[in-house]
A protein has these predicted regions:
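Extended alpha-helical scaffold segments
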Residues: 1-123
Length: 123
């Protein structure tokens, strides 16, 4: 039996300024989840690069839960970013959003790649 994927939603906000503030809050939450994940990775692999993997089933579960939390935080941030890209017409803001996309998506991809590598080596 498979379960339907969790539907990710963000609060509705009116206006660009509240959405920009919300984007910053979502990015802060993403960064906190990234810090938690990095801390958990150091417990499972002291080198934090997949070369010295060791942990028990409980730690493996924690790593998998960290991945879900990071993905959820990234998806919420991404939903808000897409809203702003559609609604905001300020060229300075649009450039800023594109720079944030490049930075945050790279952090997300790098973290997920390392975590998946660890889980495969441990599993």
């Amino acid at each position: 039996m498979t379960t339907a994927p969790e539907r990710i939603e963000i609060p509705e906000l009116a206006g660009i300024a509240p959405k920009r503030k919300s984007l910053g809050q979502f990015q802060g939450h993403f960064e906190r989840q990234l810090t938690i994940l990095e801390s958990n990775v150091k417990v499972a692999d002291q080198n934090s690069n997949g070369t010295d993997c060791h942990c028990n089933d409980e730690m493996l579960t924690i790593l998998k839960e960290s991945r879900v939390s990071l993905d959820t935080a990234f998806k919420k941030w991404h939903l808000r970013l897409n809203q702003l890209l559609e609604e905001d017409t300020d060229e300075v803001h649009l450039t800023e959003y594109k720079e944030k996309w490049t930075s945050v998506s790279k952090k997300h991809q790098d973290a997920i790649r390392l975590l998946d590598q660890l889980i495969i080596k441990i599993g």
